[in-house]
Amino acid sequence: MSSTYFHSSLLAATLFSVTLTAPAFASENTQNTPQTITTKKPQPAENTFSEKNEESYWGKFKRNLTQTWDNDQYNYYLPVWTWHNRFTYDKEKTNRYNETPWGFGMGKYRYDNEGDWHGLYAMAFMDSNNRVQPIMGYGFEKMWYPGGDREGFRMGAGFTLSVTARHEYNYIPMPLPLPLVSVGYEHLSLQATYVPGTYNNGNVLFAWLRWQ
């Protein structure tokens, strides 16, 4: 991957922002006759609708992390390809960039009750400049099973919330949220992400094999 893709890739973080809105509640008292009518006022809710949703989302996220970490099933990762988008790069740059990201990784995974994939992983590979680049994080994919068999052919799409580091930045950890897609059959999957960017920066397809 190119050395300055981080600034542009932060745009991907907007894909994971959640806009929560709280509905307005209004109370109305009417009085049709001079007679005094006593009614019991409903107790106010302990939390607003948005607060409940936010807590539920955060609670679900933590629960998914914990359940995945506690699982005893392991993934193994083999980086196989990086591709710098030829429509967004000068030929002089693509000629010298490395697109064979030798490396290895492993992690834990699980499939939830709906058949969706959750993974915690750590991986290291050779970046565009032939320097070691580590990455680790949490991944989620919504899965589809065209044949109905969860052990057979499957496709997935989702996201990863990761942290990486590069030699250009003295290996200071940096957040890197990215999209994820995959196709798989039985134990083997091909998984990939795309790093967005500008001209001569970012716009890199990164693919790896995942064995489970």
Curated annotation (Swiss-Prot):
UniProt region (Disordered), positions on chain: 29-50
Catalysed reactions, as listed in the record: a lipid A + a 1,2-diacyl-sn-glycero-3-phosphocholine = a hepta-acyl lipid A + a 2-acyl-sn-glycero-3-phosphocholine; a lipid IVA + a 1,2-diacyl-sn-glycero-3-phosphocholine = a lipid IVB + a 2-acyl-sn-glycero-3-phosphocholine; a lipid IIA + a 1,2-diacyl-sn-glycero-3-phosphocholine = a lipid IIB + a 2-acyl-sn-glycero-3-phosphocholine
Main location: membrane
Low complexity composition bias: residue spans: 29-44
Subcellular location: Cell outer membrane
MF terms (GO), sorted A to Z: acyltransferase activity
Keyword Acyltransferase: yes
Site (Role in lipopolysaccharide recognition): K93
Gene Ontology process terms (BP): lipid A biosynthetic process
Quaternary state and interactors: Homodimer.
Function: Transfers a fatty acid residue from the sn-1 position of a phospholipid to the N-linked hydroxyfatty acid chain on the proximal unit of lipid A or its precursors.
Entry's family note: Belongs to the lipid A palmitoyltransferase family.
Protein's recorded name: Lipid A acyltransferase PagP
